[in-house]
């Protein structure tokens, strides 16, 4: 009687699935337990606690998604770009919220340049200094030694309109270049100013525009690159990458342009694309990315 040999890959996959399910279960139980004890004491429910719940909720959803893919991925094969999209959206939104404003290295310098670009868009540009709403100029953020109180201070009045919306000349100067790398973050600030949002919401919108541009560029790159899709996906999901693309840093736009140049060039040389329109679009994106980079 022949004895069938056990497939080691199947055993490894089973262990990974069980591990993911256990982590997901523990995280879900922990999140419910924390929420239950906090609800009993309404005075302890603050911005930090809400942010805490959002973070664990997003991680729970992400782990559940990865677990489902691990269990049924072989039967229903999902392309890399479709697998990447929900992961980058969840992790990107998470990093956007949990990394305090001004904490990313030199972010304050990038914020002032983006704000200056917003002034150009709104016709309030000053050649000498950055014109800002008085509320935005006076709002203080702690960039070092972040504590629970700093999170509460940052998100206090997130959805409230500021009182001091008059424009004033500040001591800040726009020094970063090339300036076109700040168009999207400046657009986010402009949207916030037009909507009359709070200072924190204003800056979060600027960050969000950088993140969305990176997501779109990386999604297109993974779709177009003929091989190495997994490497691009892992690079895009690295903590240091997410930190930069979820901030005002021009690294976000540089990362997007770099990966577009690599992917479109490799697609033009090694790709087996038969659709003429797709090839034309790929070549246009390649040339535009090279020029901007």
Question: Which functions belong to the PLM regions below?
Answer:
Residues 1-23, 28, 35, 45-93:
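Start-transfer (signal-anchor) and selected internal transmembrane alpha helices
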Residues 19, 197-200, 219-240:
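Transmembrane-helix signature of polytopic, membrane-embedded enzymes
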Residues 21-30, 67, 71-108, 115-156:
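Transmembrane signal-anchor helices characteristic of membrane glycosylation enzymes that use polyprenol
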Residues 52-68, 202-227:
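Selective detector of the "anchor" transmembrane alpha-helix that sits immediately C-terminal
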Residues 120-205:
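Interfacial juxtamembrane loops and adjacent helix segments
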Residues 185, 189, 218-222, 259-271, ...:
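Hydrophobic transmembrane alpha-helices
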Residues 247-254:
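Short acidic/glycine- and proline-prone juxtamembrane loop motifs at membrane-interface regions
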Residues 280-293:
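Membrane-interface alpha helices of multi-pass inner-membrane proteins
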